Amino acid sequence: MLESDRLISSQSIVSEDAMDRAIRPLSLSEYVGQDSVSSQMQIFINAARKRNDPLDHVLIFGPPGLGKTTLANIIAHEMGVNIRQTSGPVIERAGDIAAILTNLQQNDVLFIDEIHRLSPVIEEILYPAMEDYKLDIMIGEGPAARSIKLELPPFTLIGATTRAGLLTSPLRDRFGIVQRLEYYSVDSLTQIVARSAHLLGVPTKPEGAREIALRSRGTPRIANRLLRRVRDYSEVKGNGIITVDMAQQALEMLEVDQHGFDLMDRKLLLAVIEHFNGGPVGIDSIAAAIGEEKGTIEDVLEPFLIQQGFLMRTPRGRIATSKAYQHFGFSAIEQE
């Protein structure tokens, strides 16, 4: 099973991109949640605009689906400049990054998603570009190779990553502003769902929006996806208005429970509790019990369960917590 196959996946899906752009906020005043990040960025942006300088290079990191791309677009909009978007895996050759950099205008924003996947060769080119706005690349090979030095207009590089630990120290140290995005509160997600519903023309009661928010795993991308599915259900099974009852019925049909768990989350937890007496149990045994690959369990299923306190990862194996027992209505077994 792939992460993108799940309804509650926080990964981006190509078919949703156009709709996501339609409901994406364009200014910090519309950007719900991440209050500390918003207030800091507002000050940095205002200061840069007063000086007519480019904003310092910005690194944004955090789990997928929390709005890193949205924040990058907001920064460019607030600065009143253009944004050029690309991603780490796409930039394969020195000529690729050179073409992008030489086409930037003064104070423009270059946004690189998945920046941790840049090759070392590309990183080496970025260092002088970020520090001195100079491009130094080699053209040709062997005896015919020659170095070309170009002046670049001042610009802002915004890098986004879900895995900040994979960034090399020299690259990470060149970002003057580093922002971490956290999972959203239910109140913030409720505001996001209500705003998206309004923009999509979906009549939604406040309680209906909150019910969707409760099951969205702290992630706006999931909240907006669930909103679209609940909208479909309400139009077919109801009168098109999303009430709390309609949201509950739709999400129960979609097998997304009150904690945002789907069938695979529940299957994993129940396997640990029922098959292995709550653990500790090794990852290979869990994989065999639920018929999933070890990598899928470690990368797709476990992180949210651990983050929410339903599962513990210990040197002896995985252990279901008392919170997991309570979720399924079991009495917790005393762990040694």
Curated annotation (Swiss-Prot):
It is an enzyme of class 3 (hydrolase). It catalyses: ATP + H2O = ADP + phosphate + H(+). DNA binds at residues 313, 318. It is found in: Cytoplasm. It comes from the Bacteria. Residues 185-255 are annotated as: Small ATPAse domain (RuvB-S). Residues 4-184 are annotated as: Large ATPase domain (RuvB-L). The RuvA-RuvB-RuvC complex processes Holliday junction (HJ) DNA during genetic recombination and DNA repair, while the RuvA-RuvB complex plays an important role in the rescue of blocked DNA replication forks via replication fork reversal (RFR). RuvA specifically binds to HJ cruciform DNA, conferring on it an open structure. The RuvB hexamer acts as an ATP-dependent pump, pulling dsDNA into and through the RuvAB complex. RuvB forms 2 homohexamers on either side of HJ DNA bound by 1 or 2 RuvA tetramers; 4 subunits per hexamer contact DNA at a time. Belongs to the RuvB family. This is Holliday junction branch migration complex subunit RuvB. It comes from Legionella pneumophila subsp. pneumophila (strain Philadelphia 1 / ATCC 33152 / DSM 7513).
